[in-house]
């Protein structure tokens, strides 16, 4: 679908960091180049706000990553990793990210979600109908929900240029499990490591 993009258009970018991180890790054994994700999401329009939803791990080694995001103009909202009896871990920002997008929609012309998670389909439908916003998604197509791709006004497939959207990309074996693993791994709480370079 063709979308309208112009310099005066007000955009908000909402980044599901866990989803992109695990997709890049499982598909390309690499890290995400958030600088290029942000540039291509904004596309020379008027950025109102960019927020990355992130998880604090037990080790705390993600602090350098948070600082790197701040340097390129991305705010972070953090949540502690929950560890349940038996060792199960959970770190899920889906509801918080969707609520922020809905709350900010009246101040935006376009909402850009950086995620491939199909849980956002109801939020996308609400933003388009009740919010009157153009809704775009930027994510790795191989690990993205087919339904999410269908309901958005534009889907930017990061798999079409993995070198642009990853740092240290090495294509993983093209198996059916690679794409499923990216989605399944979401929220497992693996350590982020530090981002050495975003540009």
Show where each model-derived region lies.
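Terminal and domain-boundary accessory regions
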Residues: 1-199
């Amino acid at each position: 679908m063709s979308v309208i993009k112009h310099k005066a258009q007000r955009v908000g970018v909402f980044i599901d960091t866990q989803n992109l991180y695990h997709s890049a890790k499982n598909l390309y054994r690499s890290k995400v180049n958030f600088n290029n994700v942000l540039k291509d999401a904004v596309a020379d329009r008027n950025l109102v706000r960019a927020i990355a939803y992130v998880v604090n791990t037990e080790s705390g080694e993600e602090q350098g990553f948070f600082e790197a995001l701040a340097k390129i103009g991305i705010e972070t909202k953090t949540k502690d990793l929950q560890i349940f009896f038996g060792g199960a871990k959970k770190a899920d920002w889906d509801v918080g990210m969707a609520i922020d997008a809905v709350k900010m929609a009246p101040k935006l012309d376009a909402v850009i979600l950086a995620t491939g998670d199909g849980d956002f389909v109801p939020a996308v439908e609400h933003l388009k109908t009740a919010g009157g916003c153009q809704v775009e998604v930027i994510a790795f197509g191989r690990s993205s929900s087919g339904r999410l791709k269908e309901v958005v006004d534009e889907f930017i497939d990061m798999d079409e240029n993995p070198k642009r959207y990853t740092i240290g990309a090495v294509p993983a074996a093209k198996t059916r499990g690679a794409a499923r693993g990216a989605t399944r791994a979401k929220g497992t709480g693996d350590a982020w490591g530090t981002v050495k370079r975003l540009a």
